[in-house]
Amino acid sequence: NNFEKIHLCYGIHKAYEDIKDFKNAFKFLKKGNELLKIETKYEFKNDEKKIQDNINLYKKIKKVQTSGTHRDLIFIVGMPRSGSSLVEQILVSHKKVFGGGEIPYIQEIAQKIINEEKFDASLIDNYRNEYLALIAELNDSSSVFTDKELLNFKCIGLILSLFPNAKIINCTREPVDNCWSIYKNFFPIKTGFVNNF
């Protein structure tokens, strides 16, 4: 099957890279990414639409006055391979911080709100409470919670509307190094944009 071929290509790439045969290493890396690109069916226009939807959502949301929350939340956003795991590890080394990892809740909530016809403060409050209930299932004892879903950068307006006191850490890295690191590592289908060099 295609995924076996993809993993084989990435493995052969790594073997060639280890013996410094970079020409053959890149050949297999490129093939693995091409096969993965077929599986992801990634279309840039779909991301453009999601980003525009989130911009429109924020324009709607910022007009609505809502209550805040007392839960301390830290959202770690950015590109994959930008140092976000290290940032979260450093934060959770503190006894009052719980690392939630990569949680898809915010993007799911954004999509739900985008699909809502009626929009008011109670709706925002409901979704805020839904998110807090979901993370409470993961950990309710730590006073600070981190959410490291990197692609939440698309939803920063929503995050700050739901949680005005939230902290956002945007992880960045030198762009060429970041893109190369992304390209040469296998990523799940949800990050389909990573397979085009």
How would you label these PLM feature ranges?
Residues V97-G100, Y105-K118, S141-F197:
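PAPS-dependent sulfotransferase catalytic domain
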Residues N1-L138:
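Alpha-helical solenoid repeat scaffolds of the TPR/TPR-like class and their adjacent stem/linker regions
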